[in-house]
Design a protein with these regions (language model features):
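Catalytic cores of carbohydrate-active enzymes across secretory and cytosolic contexts
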Residues: 1-529
Length: 529
C-alpha cells in the first residue's frame, strides 16, 4: 500500500472562484491534489483559509496597478467540527478546520482562526510584516499537524511544499520530546517522515527570521535556542530547516536540481536534493476540443483558430482592444518579477516598431505584481504604457487569474518566456500552453531544456549560457533572431506549424502532466529506501 501523505502548502490554486493562491506555487499545489484524486492516491492537502484571498488588480488612469482584497463566497467549505489551538505570541489562537473537495481534488484541510480578533492572521496571503508572516506559518505548520492528529489521520509522509511549513517539523519533534525522547533521537525519528520541495533558485529569495522573534511569537514549540539553531541556524533559515528536517528533498526541474544542489551543498546535515520536474493537471488546462482534434491536421488548426477567437473576444470584452485573428499572437502571462523580464522584447525600439507597424505580430500580456512590490508595480505600469503606445497591437489584460490563464494558454499562437537563466525554477505556464498546441519560444531555463526540440515543437532563445556579460543584450538579440528567422517564417507555413503544434501537444501530454509528477513523487520521494 502506498503511504498516506499530508501535503502542506501556503496556497492552493483550485479554481478562480476560490482565490487562495498567488501564483505558480499555489497552482502547482492545486494540480497536485487534483491528480492525487484522479489517481486515487492517499493524499490530504493542508493549508490556510484566506479571508480575502489574493489581490484583485485594477489599473489607475495613469496605468499604475492598484490592489483590492474583496471577500469571496465560500459556501463550498465543509466544517469538520475539529478545533485546534496554537500559541501565537502571548495568545492561544483557536482555529477551525475546514474541508474542501469541490473541484475534483483530494481532501484539502484549511485552517482559519475562530475569534474575530485573531482573523488578522489569515486576512491576506503573504502579509509583509514579520509578525503576520510567522503567525501564518505557525498556524499552517503547528496547527496543521494538530489538525491531522485530531482528525485521526494516520499520516506516514509529511510533505512540505516550500519552507513555509517547517514549523510542522518543529512541532513533531516537540511531540516526541514531550514523551521523553531526547532531541537528537526525536529529530532522527521525525526526519524519516518528512520530505521537502524547494522552489527558489537564489539564496536571497529564501525566508530567514531572527531566532529571538520566532521565540517571542511561539514558533519554537518548547525547543530551546541551540536546538532551533541546529535545525535552521541563527538567524533561522526556513529552507535550511526544510533540508535538515527531511529525509529527502527535491527541486522542480532538472536544471533547478543542479542549481539547488550547488546552492545548498555547504549546508551540514542537509538531505539529498533530487529533481522531479513539475507537471500540470491535463483536465484543468487542456481544452477538451484540443484532445478531440489530436491526430487531425485540419481539426487541430480549426480548433486552435476557434480558441484564438475566444481569446480575442475575451480581450475585447475586458480591455476594448481589438486584435487581428490572422496575425501571429504572442502571449506572456506570469507574475511581475524583474528576473522574468516581461518587457525584454520592447528594449530594441526600432525592431519592435518595425514588426508591429508591419502587422507581423501582436502581443498579449497579463500578470500581477505582489501588492507590496514597488518594482513589480513599475513592471506592470511599463507594460500598460507599451499597450497605450501600440494600441490594438499590444494589450495588457488586468487581473490575471486561473480563468484568464486558461483562455490565454489555449488561444495564443506562441508562448513567450524570457527569464534570466537559471532563475526560473520550472515555469509551468509553458506546459499548459504546449498541451493546447501553443508553441513555446523560451530561454532554455526551467522545464524547457527537457522538452525543447528546436524548430520541431517550439524554439529556444539563445544557447543556454548564463552568467555571461550583457546577458540581457545577448538574450534580446537571440529573441529577435529566432522570432524573425524561425517563428514568423514557420507561421507562414501552415502545414509545418500544425505539425509543430501536434509535436508539442504530444511531448507535454506524455512527460509534463501532474499525473506523471504525482507518480514520480510516490516512487522517488515518498517510498522508503
Amino acid at each position: 500500500m502506498p503511504p498516506t501523505v499530508a501535503y502542506f502548502c501556503m496556497e492552493f490554486g483550485l479554481h478562480e472562484d476560490f482565490p487562495i493562491y498567488a501564483g505558480g506555487l499555489g497552482i502547482l499545489a492545486g494540480d497536485f491534489i487534483k491528480s492525487a484524486h484522479d489517481l486515487k492516491r492517499p493524499v490530504v492537502g493542508v493549508g490556510l483559509r484566506w479571508a480575502r484571498g489574493y489581490s484583485r488588480q485594477r489599473l489607475g488612469p495613469e496605468g499604475v496597478p492598484t490592489d483590492e482584497f474583496p471577500e469571496y463566497p465560500a459556501d463550498f467549505l465543509d466544517d469538520t467540527g475539529v478545533r485546534v489551538r496554537v500559541r501565537v505570541a502571548a495568545r492561544e489562537v483557536e482555529a477551525r478546520v475546514w474541508r474542501v473537495e469541490r473541484w475534483g481534488n483530494a481532501p484539502l484541510l484549511l485552517l482559519e482562526p475562530v475569534a474575530e480578533g485573531d482573523r488578522w492572521i489569515t486576512r491576506r496571503l503573504y502579509e509583509p510584516t514579520l509578525d503576520a508572516r510567522v503567525a501564518q506559518e505557525i498556524l499552517l505548520g503547528v496547527g496543521g499537524v494538530r489538525a491531522l492528529r485530531k482528525l485521526g489521520l494516520d499520516v506516514e509522509v509529511f510533505h512540505f511544499n516550500e519552507g513555509h511549513a517547517v514549523f510542522a517539523g518543529v512541532e513533531m519533534i516537540a511531540e516526541r520530546m514531550a514523551e521523553g525522547v531526547p532531541f537528537r533521537e526525536a529529530w532522527d525519528q521525525v526526519r524519516q517522515q518528512i520530505v521537502f520541495t524547494t522552489h527558489t533558485p537564489i539564496p536571497a529569495g529564501n525566508e530567514v527570521h531572527p531566532q529571538a522573534e520566532l521565540r517571542r511569537l511561539g514558533a519554537c514549540c518548547e525547543l530551546v535556542d541551540w536546538e532551533m539553531e541546529q535545525l535552521g541556524g541563527n538567524p533561522f533559515n526556513m529552507t535550511v530547516a526544510g533540508l535538515r528536517l527531511s529525509r529527502r528533498a527535491n527541486a522542480v526541474s532538472a536544471l533547478h536540481g543542479e542549481v539547488s544542489r550547488a546552492m545548498w551543498r555547504d549546508v551540514e546535515g542537509a538531505s539529498e536534493i533530487v529533481a522531479i520536474t513539475n507537471g500540470v493537471h491535463v483536465p484543468t488546462w487542456q481544452d477538451a476540443r484540443i484532445r478531440e482534434a489530436r491526430g487531425s491536421a485540419i481539426g487541430l488548426w480549426e480548433t486552435h483558430q476557434a480558441l484564438k477567437r475566444e481569446l480575442l473576444d475575451a480581450i475585447a470584452a475586458r480591455t476594448g482592444a481589438h486584435l487581428d485573428p490572422d496575425v501571429l499572437t504572442i502571449g506572456f502571462a506570469r507574475r511581475a518579477a524583474s528576473y522574468k523580464r516581461s518587457d525584454l522584447i520592447f528594449r530594441d525600439r526600432a525592431r519592435i516598431d518595425g514588426l508591429l507597424a508591419g502587422r507581423r505580430l501582436q502581443l498579449v500580456f497579463a500578470g500581477k505584481n505582489h501588492p507590496d512590490d514597488a518594482e513589480g508595480r513599475r513592471i506592470v505600469a511599463n507594460l500598460v504604457a507599451m499597450a497605450r503606445r501600440y494600441p490594438d497591437m499590444v494589450v495588457f489584460v488586468p487581473d490575471y487569474d486561473m480563468g484568464l490563464a486558461r483562455v490565454l494558454t489555449r488561444g495564443a499562437d506562441v508562448w513567450l518566456n524570457n527569464p534570466i537563466r537559471p532563475l526560473e525554477a520550472c515555469g509551468t505556464s509553458g506546459m499548459k500552453a504546449a498541451l493546447n498546441g501553443v508553441l513555446n519560444l523560451s530561454v532554455l531555463d526551467g522545464w524547457w531544456p527537457e522538452a525543447c526540440d528546436h524548430g520541431r515543437n517550439g524554439w529556444a532563445i539563445g544557447d543556454g549560457a548564463d552568467g555571461v556579460p550583457d546577458q540581457d543584450g545577448r538574450d534580446l538579440e537571440a529573441l529577435y533572431a529566432t522570432l524573425e528567422g524561425d517563428v514568423l517564417p514557420a507561421y507562414a507555413d501552415r502545414e509545418r506549424w500544425v505539425n509543430m503544434m501536434q509535436a508539442c501537444i504530444d511531448v507535454a501530454a506524455a512527460r509534463f502532466s501532474s499525473d506523471r509528477m504525482v507518480e514520480e513523487y510516490f516512487a522517488r520521494l515518498y517510498a522508503r529506501g
